[in-house]
Amino acid sequence: MSTSEVSPAQRVHRLRDRLGGLGFGGDYNPEQWDDATRAEDLRLMREAGVTLVNLAVFGWGRVEPARDAYDFRYFDTVMDDLAAHGIAADLATMTASPPAWLATEHPEMLPVTADGTVLSPGGRQHFCPSSPVYRDRAVKLAEALAAHYADHPALAMWHVGNEYGIHVAECFCDVSAADFRRWLADRYGSVDKLNDAWSTDFWSQRYTGFAQILPPRVAPTYPNPAQQLDFKRFSNDALLTCFRLERDALRRITPDVPVTTNFLAGHKTVDWYAWAPEMDVAALDSYPDPHGPHEHIAAAIAYDALRGATGGAPWLLTEQAPSAVNWRARNAGKAPGRMRLWSWQAVAQGADAVMYFQWRQSRGGAEKFHSGMVPHAGADSRVYREVRALGRELARVPELAGTESSNDVAVLFDWNAWWALELDSHPSDAVRALERLFDHYAPLFDLGVGVDVVHPSADLTGYRLVVLPSLYLLSEDHAARIADFVAAGGTLLASFFTGIVDEHDRVHLGGYPGPLRDVLGIRVEEFWPAADGEPVPLRAAPGGPEPAEPGSLWREDVGLAGAVPELLFTGPDWDDRPAATVHAHGRGTARYVATRPDPAAMRDLTRRALADAGVDPVLPGLPPGVQAVVRRGDGYDVLIVLNHTEEPVTVTLPAERRDLLAADRPLVAGLTLEPRGVAVLGTTGMAADR
């Protein structure tokens, strides 16, 4: 069967049928252990309900100990054992960490930093993404693996690379420089168009030929910001090319096997919105910090962003920690019940698999203190008992696999805007993309509203409220789409430093926020960022919410051009200047926030925007800290309620539902959730028992 005859949806459907419900498992690294331990692993996996493992992520050195000398015997045994125990393999192409012999034979493939430092092997990801040597050897290995395991009964999915770009996202070597020049020539066509896009007449940076252009290496002062931005785009594309080359090799030989790779939440190096459409199913590694009081909200943002990147399709949680990680300054374990809670949160927000790094905690190596499903203490441990209980629980709700969510609120996010916002030479380096995203997402989460985090090019017609969290880079085309959305009756909530530059980091002239001025009914002349720790005093305008605390981070000189103020700045030089505004545009409403209000005030402003849009919470009347999400199937839906607090809570349902985690799935009209508790509630028409 040719690749063109099998669609991504068909590949994923086959995977879902193979797993029989939600996937459960983790990274399996049997090469670290002896035969007796491997035998125990298989027994414990069956006991815990493991259905899927990520296999051989770092196996290149074992299967190709010398050039073209492939030796699959070890993993043949492992694959045979997995198949015999009914466990599917997400088999890695093993290309995340090239073997020592390859780096020794081809030192030119090693990555180079902006200051010219060559990064040595000894860690992982020690390759230049543009290296023809690396790409050639990676594709050859992928082809050899596909040919060898094409018909193996354990093979369920291919896992290409691993967490692309988290250690080496950019390479500044001469090979990358030549590849960058080719990329620029394809993008711009002529050096004159590049000069215009990069504003090279500033500081006499004009080029007369592409051969003169280098990556933004260390320079006497700030490199050209448009050059930096394009180099980030190029670097993203170079890594994506590596993925595509391996994916295409796999599909030529195993066209019906789905292909994925895994993102790492919180990293800005690869653009999820560009990568996810290239995969059959997207995957994410998520490591919330148990020390953080709002980590469940940060995780929720990542899950909604990945679902936005997939167009609403389910995704796979390929890694999380059973308890502690090893790479923070202070590595807290997860309190009893938290691993279960955070796993179900991922499922609620679209995950069709719950997996961990890793199955058995390593005895040696850099990650030996990263927890495992089977920890150093062995199976007689709290962590393993919680893992086993969760595996059995997930197996009770196979109907969740393949279900999707739909929401009325879209938060717009763009990796290009993230990259551009955090370049140098801005009014304030304290304005950070993820923090601004959190500031807008958190009140929506607190108010119980479902959210999609989508790219500005997404179709907005199905949404009622669109949020722009300091979306610094905004093209004229995307701005026009937003304006049309509001004019047609939608509600917009935008915050400061939005719509400032175009896709080439050139300022939209005529006053800020550029192409959104008319929609918002304002015109900003100047930015006045606050100093570190400096309060920004605020008060309510007539009819506006009264802030309990000062704002922070930012203020700007907002001129009204049809908008009405809701918050006002106070204090010397700022008394009664607008700090938050509302404006009627067409049949819709556009709101603007010119500072960072305290969380309560931001929640009040968000509540007003939701009222304008007619958006209700998923489950009205929820106590603070309780999350509710609905996943919808064919003729049924499942409501998942998560108690992120340390207190028991009582939840009343608007109609009876089936408690899908309880024996015989009884009907319930309400429930009490223990601290860190979870409820999974189906519609009454679902089967009464499993």
Predicted feature locations:
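N-terminal carbohydrate-binding accessory modules
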Residues: 1-54, 65, 80-81, 88, ...
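Polysaccharide-binding and catalytic clefts of secreted carbohydrate-active enzymes
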Residues: 116-281, 285-299
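Carbohydrate-binding surfaces of carbohydrate-active enzymes
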Residues: 210-213, 265, 276, 287-690
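Short, well-ordered coil/turn segments that N-cap beta-strands
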Residues: 20-22, 49-51, 83-89, 151-156, ...
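The substrate-binding groove and active-site-proximal loops of carbohydrate-active enzymes
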Residues: 23-33, 56-73, 120-139, 164-168, ...
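Short, acidic/polar
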Residues: 33-47, 138-144, 264-275, 335-343
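Conserved, mostly hydrophobic/aromatic
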Residues: 26, 45, 53, 82, ...
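Aromatic-lined substrate-binding rim segments of carbohydrate-active enzymes
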Residues: 40-46, 54-118, 246-253
